Amino acid sequence: MSFTVAIVGRPNVGKSTLFNRLVGKKLALVDDTPGVTRDRRPGDAKLVDLKFRIIDTAGLEQSAPDSLQGRMWAQTEQAIDEADLSLFVIDAKAGLTPADETLAEMLRRRGKPVIVVANKSEARGSDGGFYDAFTLGLGEPCPISAEHGQGMLDLRDAIVAALGEERAFPPREDVAETDVDIRPAGAGGGEDEESEPAYDKTKPLRVAIVGRPNAGKSTLINRFLGEDRLLTGPEAGITRDSISVEWEWRGRTIKMFDTAGMRRKAKVQEKLEKLSVADALRAIRFAETVVIIFDATIPFEKQDLQIVDLVLREGRAAVLAFNKWDLVEDWQAVLADLREKTERLLPQARGIRAVPISGHTGYGLDRLMQAIIETDKVWNRRISTARLNRWLESQQVQHPPPAVSGRRLKLKYMTQVKARPPGFMISCTRPEAVPESYVRYLINGLRNDFDMPGVPIRVHFRAADNPFESKARKRR
């Protein structure tokens, strides 16, 4: 991206609506409730022929530094310092307020380029607010409607004028040519097409951090990053949007998603909380590995188990992190109890990796990252058809399929049809009659014999092809 733009303003003036308009997606939560946005959210924006990085910020209201509003103010100030330009959004319909004037003074002191954006200018009676914006002393305001997309061309021209042509349109870097493999797919230089592909260690890994409110999700991510990137505090439910951050661990790019705390469905009444939970669910579906944060001082609440079940039903790789380990006293006894409960209460995730950590002190974070990488390897694993069919034969010798209605089931052929998560197809007689207990037997066998702990495994059955069926039809 060529430059960075911060969107700032008091609460409920349409900052997140403008952010969504510029990134071309509904990434930020939008609601009539003031103060929806709390953390700063980055995104890749496109405005006509401009491409740039943009940061959505919390609505600015001066408060005590230790209060939630004060910590939100500090986050927004950091975004302004990172940016090359600020879009100062005002509500042209409502007109200027003392809070707008306070923000204008703060932006003037920063000494960076500022564009006053008079949003909601399509509304009747917005002219007064537009002309009042001249009194802020930050230049000519740019009238727009973020909701309807009006005034975007004028905003583009204002950005170019504020930054200058050279900064707004940096020269393109020449991309060096690289050798390209032009062999057709499958021409692997004599390699067996059934060989199991190696794990790609260079691919960025998407990780979602989920859990109940106040389990320490944002604190954990801040510890990974080594900075107070996300708002934290004793208040439950601080995080509302699913915020993504990128960093590197041992040369591997990690894209980590902080999510809103997920309460029991019956307790979620407010529209805004429902939007936050829906955003967290989207983050789970977009992620590859999901870290479920348990509070080690009160683990295995009913909601914890429901979150694990949700993650596995979505087909994601899961890792458990028992946070706040620094508050545990008899840690050996607690650890033994947690391991026993993990095996007993989560039979659908047998062998799931569970790591005691402390987001506050940093204890166990290296082991947690190793568990994430190892679980992702299993989630991506592919097994050759030859190995699977040898395994299927041995499983039937050890435990033959049961007879249903006096007729023995026959499992004839097995292959892996997908990874992420591992999915297998077995050709058999009467697939609809295979008992659930025998399906579990096969899944547990796959998990143990091919070392696939803690990831969801899908096994499907289909009717075996009958080679005599076509001849029988011809006779008819």
From Swiss-Prot:
The keyword Nucleotide-binding applies. GTP 2 binds at residues 211-218, 258-262, 323-326. GTP 1 binds at residues 9-16, 56-60, 119-122. SUPFAM superfamilies: P-loop containing nucleoside triphosphate hydrolases (SSF52540). Residues 178-199 are annotated as: Disordered. InterPro entries: G_ENGA, GTP-bd, GTPase_Der, KH_dom-like, KH_dom-like_a/b, P-loop_NTPase, Small_GTP-bd. GO terms for biological process: ribosome biogenesis. It holds the Pfam family MMR_HSR1. Residues 381-465 form the KH-like domain. Residues 3-167, 205-380 form the EngA-type G domain. HAMAP family: GTPase_Der. Associates with the 50S ribosomal subunit. GTPase that plays an essential role in the late steps of ribosome biogenesis. This is GTPase Der. It comes from Sinorhizobium fredii (strain NBRC 101917 / NGR234). The gene is der.
